[in-house]
Structure formats: C-alpha cells, structure tokens
Amino acid sequence: MSELKQAAAPEQALVVGRITSVYGVKGWVKLYSHTEPMQGIFDYKHWWLKTPSGWKTVELSQGRLQGRGLVASVKGYTDRDQVKDICGMDVYIDAAELPELEEGDYYWSQLEGLRVITKEGVLLGKVSQLMETGANDVIVVRACEGSFDREERLIPYAPGTYVLNIDLEQQEMVVDWDPEF
C-alpha cells in the first residue's frame, strides 16, 4: 500500500523537480531535479504532489545519483506498479524550507514573473523563465500587457552589466537593454 496522503497545499508551493519514470522493480523512480546541485532535491524529505484529486504528500526514503541522473525511493512504495501512479508528477516543496540567501542573491523562482523594465523606463515584458547556458544564465522575457512590443527577448543574467536592479517588493527588474534589440 502506498503512502500518498491527502494534504493541504504548501504555503508557497515551489517546483523542485519531476518524477519522470519507474526505475527497477522495487518501487524506485527516476527524477529530474531543478535544484543546483541536482542532488539538492534530496535535502527535502517531504514532497508535495499535485494530483487530480488535490495535494498529496510523500516522504523521501532514499535518493542517489545513478549514471547522469537521479533515482529515489519513496516511503511506502515497494513495487513498480505502485509508483506508476506518481510518474509524470512535479515535486513541490514549501518555499519556506529553502535556505536563506545572501543579499543580492535570488532563487530563480523569485525572478519569474517580474516585470522587466529598461533603465529608461520602457516595459519589455515579464520574466517567463531562466535558462542555464554555458557562459551566462539567460532571462527569457515575454511580452505582457503594456509592453513595448510583442517580442520575446533573451537577456543575459549578468548583474551589474545587463541586470541593474531587482526589486522583489515592486516585482520589477531594471535592465540595461535596447528595446529595439
């Protein structure tokens, strides 16, 4: 019998990964992690899963690096047929569980949704996501109501160079970026 328990939604639900598929025959699953480093997902023992019938919680039993990916065992799941039900689900934690950051450091989830404004005051859009590339992380800015145009922009996340200011209270990011580019 599985340990999928009905639960209230986390105060601030934050996706930290995804259960991608079954691994082996003893109830293990493969994981895709959004944490840095990727094994950081194992620091959170209680996971929330958003199911069609509401929020459920599961408890991480074990986790490890397997090849170039991650695998985990969830408490109460002992065979592959049981874990099939949770494959494809995002893994959430409560954002309150995240460690405190130093001033000027941000979690990507804090930046998603911020309005992006040039230093001249032109609204370019909102941060839809961030991407990891080889050199710099990149901010994906999508047009929103009131934005300069309907273009999507890719702006290097380079604080002090392109990113001039981030104000979480005002939900704004000021950038040094030509709106025509």
Swiss-Prot record:
Main location group: cytoplasm
Domain of life per record: Bacteria
Gene Ontology biological process terms from the UniProt entry: ribosomal small subunit biogenesis; rRNA processing
The PRC barrel domain, residue ranges: 103-181
Gene3D superfamilies attached to this UniProt entry: PRC-barrel domain, RimM
Membrane-spanning segments: none
One term of GO molecular function: ribosome binding
Keywords: Chaperone, Cytoplasm, Ribosome biogenesis, rRNA processing
Localization in the cell: Cytoplasm
GO CC, alphabetical: cytoplasm; ribosome
Function summary: An accessory protein needed during the final step in the assembly of 30S ribosomal subunit, possibly for assembly of the head region. Essential for efficient processing of 16S rRNA. May be needed both before and after RbfA during the maturation of 16S rRNA. It has affinity for free ribosomal 30S subunits but not for 70S ribosomes.
Family, per entry: Belongs to the RimM family.
Domain comment quoted from the record: The PRC barrel domain binds ribosomal protein uS19.
Subunit structure: Binds ribosomal protein uS19.
NCBIfam families given in the database record: 16S_RimM (TIGR02273)
PANTHER family, alphabetized: RIBOSOME MATURATION FACTOR RIMM
Record protein name field: Ribosome maturation factor RimM
Gene, per the UniProt record: rimM
